[in-house]
Amino acid sequence: MYKCALILAAGKGKRMKSDLPKVLHKVCDKEMVNHVIDTMRKSELQDVNVVIGKGAELVREATSKKNISYSLQSEQLGTGHAVKCAEDFLRGKDGVVAIFTGDAPLITEDTVKNLIDFHEKGGYKATIITALIDNPEGYGRIIRNVDGSVKKIVEHKDCTEDELKVKEINSAMYCFDIKSLLESLDKLNNNNVQGEYYLTDVIGILEEEGAKIGAISVPFEEILGVNSRLQLCQVGKVMQKRINEKHMENGSTLIDPDNTYIGADVEIESDTIIYPGNVLQGKTVIKTGCVLYPNSRIEDSVIGKNVTVQSSVILESKVGEDTTVGPFAYIRPESNIGNKVRIGDFVEIKKSTIGNNTKVSHLTYIGDAEVGEGCNFGCGTVVVNYDGKDKHKTVIGNKSFIGCNTNLVSPVTVEDNTYIAAGSTITNKVPEGSLAIARAKQVVKEGWVDKKGLLK
């Protein structure tokens, strides 16, 4: 049977007080709407359509790699109107459509599959996701028939005294028979205080026609939506707890999960230890046996086996096996650090390759460089890669020794097995096996201080 999803993502979200469309605010390093799209894809649905409106182009851009289609709701006239805007997507399809909102990112793959399975097996024309909560104040109530099918949805303000006692609430997430949904959409009206078309009215229309309507209950946290910054924080905490628990179940140790921030798409292999204050983002991969000491940020990077990182930033780069980074190192995008390398304190690497077994222990800048294996950089070395207009490349051969406070003025090549004396400024090629000294010869003028009368 054909199965598809419709994600309602057209609202601006006034309570967010933001120029960014609400569904593009991030939860655990991913836009809320992309959380929902990814869940739909994992649920093996054939097609996903997103209804966009406010900030439509921004939403398109953020979701452009997701292989989805779009429907435009140019004017926000309610949830029923949003679904009507997707009629072209639904028309001609024979099957079911699951409808979710782009601001409720906690829905799970299991729930989507269970919803559709329950809908099919029960022979329902519509199925509602519900939740049971102790304090249902403000939520629409699910009123069931004796046989367990849904009789109606009653908004809180319209509930009778008995209906107010019901603790089962509507989530605004549904599964519909597509043909029945389209027929009911044609019968919707906006005869209400808000002048809007409500998707909940479709349930009433189907019930009046004698259609069978079901409901499946899920944990309340799954249906949590975001309408404010406070709710964004609340949803983020639930999502982060899920993510961190998943990694711990897979064999990683998180010393303090409440203070460890791991993005939704981060991969961590077993036997890695993560201390508090770490922030792992993007498509980062942490291989087995790593130790991440407190307060590092790693984004879109691959960290090899048995790497130790201390209080450092690594962006869009690769770090090889058995390497140590930090404390207070900065590895900038497009850097490739080899195996058994030492990147020490206050070292900055930018768009450079560092060969295996090389040591860059402290207070060094390496930019736009290709560094060989087994090299040693003395404290205070600077690769001078920028001439005020263009960036230039530096090549340093294997087993080169760069003395303290050396300036390598790019473009320049230092060949294999070379030594550069401390304090040198290198502007020309250094041949293999050479010692380069590029500094003024020391001159000592004895008695000069007395002659100048500088002693007091």
Curated annotation (Swiss-Prot):
Superkingdom per UniProt: Bacteria
Entry EC no(s): 2.7.7.23, 2.3.1.157
Residues involved in acetyl-CoA binding: N385, Y386, A422, R439
This protein's UniProt keywords: Acyltransferase, Cell shape, Cell wall biogenesis/degradation, Cytoplasm, Magnesium, Metal-binding, Multifunctional enzyme, Nucleotidyltransferase, Peptidoglycan synthesis, Repeat, Transferase
Keyword Nucleotidyltransferase carried by entry: yes
One Pfam match: Hexapep
InterPro entries hit by this protein: Bifunctional_GlmU, GlmU-like, GlmU_C_LbH, Hexapep, Hexapep_transf_CS, NTP_transferase_dom, Nucleotide-diphossugar_trans, Trimer_LpxA-like_sf
Pathway: Nucleotide-sugar biosynthesis; UDP-N-acetyl-alpha-D-glucosamine biosynthesis; N-acetyl-alpha-D-glucosamine 1-phosphate from alpha-D-glucosamine 6-phosphate (route II): step 2/2; Nucleotide-sugar biosynthesis; UDP-N-acetyl-alpha-D-glucosamine biosynthesis; UDP-N-acetyl-alpha-D-glucosamine from N-acetyl-alpha-D-glucosamine 1-phosphate: step 1/1; Bacterial outer membrane biogenesis; LPS lipid A biosynthesis
Binding-site positions, Mg(2+): D103, N227
Family: In the N-terminal section; belongs to the N-acetylglucosamine-1-phosphate uridyltransferase family. In the C-terminal section; belongs to the transferase hexapeptide repeat family.
Protein name: Bifunctional protein GlmU
